[in-house]
């Protein structure tokens, strides 16, 4: 998979989750913030990142930088994905199914954010297991990374697309 140069893309970002986290030290607690951010160009490129800092805006900025470093390309067929897929991360699983035009994004919070910035506008999803935003975002990213076009599968197997699709 080729590395995506985020500097050449017009990216939109969404903050999925912000948490105040604490480090317990001898003198009490040290508070900081972590921000889970997704970025995408709306045309099949998407990335997710985690930023941690003492202040919220700085954590969001760091999350955006991390997300730009972890971008993947999603094969889209029109406004949906080529086939159904199950993505796993930790105890969270996300089922993604292609949908007819006009269906919209049927998804929960964290999964919806990833799909919207990726440019998927018609999809059915089901979140299974953990509802933790980190697990949901990473499971969605894992599913999107695993998607393949019929042409690519046919080329790998040395067959025609018609033979693959039956």
Curated annotation (Swiss-Prot):
PROSITE patterns: RIBOSOMAL_S5, S5_DSRBD. GO terms for molecular function: rRNA binding; structural constituent of ribosome. Disulfide bonds: none annotated. GO terms for biological process: translation. Keywords: Ribonucleoprotein, Ribosomal protein, RNA-binding, rRNA-binding. Coiled coil: none annotated. Transmembrane segments: none annotated. One of its GO terms (cellular component) is small ribosomal subunit. The N-terminal domain interacts with the head of the 30S subunit; the C-terminal domain interacts with the body and contacts protein S4. The interaction surface between S4 and S5 is involved in control of translational fidelity. HAMAP family: Ribosomal_uS5_B. Part of the 30S ribosomal subunit. Contacts proteins S4 and S8. With S4 and S12 plays an important role in translational accuracy. Located at the back of the 30S subunit body where it stabilizes the conformation of the head with respect to the body. PANTHER family: MITOCHONDRIAL RIBOSOMAL PROTEIN S5 (PTHR48277:SF1). Belongs to the universal ribosomal protein uS5 family. This is Small ribosomal subunit protein uS5. The gene is rpsE.
């Amino acid at each position: 998979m080729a590395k995506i140069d985020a500097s050449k893309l017009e990216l939109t970002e969404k903050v999925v989750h912000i948490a105040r986290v604490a480090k317990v030290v001898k003198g009490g607690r040290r508070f900081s913030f972590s921000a889970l951010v997704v970025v995408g160009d709306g045309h099949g490129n998407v990335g997710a990142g985690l930023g941690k800092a003492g202040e919220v805006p700085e954590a969001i900025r760091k999350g955006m930088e991390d997300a730009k470093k972890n971008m993947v390309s999603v094969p889209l067929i029109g406004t949906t994905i080529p086939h159904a897929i199950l993505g796993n991360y930790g105890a969270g699983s996300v089922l993604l199914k292609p949908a007819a035009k006009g269906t919209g994004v049927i998804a929960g919070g964290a999964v919806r954010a990833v799909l919207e910035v990726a440019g998927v506008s018609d999809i059915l999803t089901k979140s299974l297991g953990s509802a933790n935003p980190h697990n949901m975002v990473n499971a969605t990213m894992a599913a999107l990374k695993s998607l393949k076009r019929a042409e690519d599968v046919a080329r790998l197997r040395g067959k025609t697309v018609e033979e693959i699709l039956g």
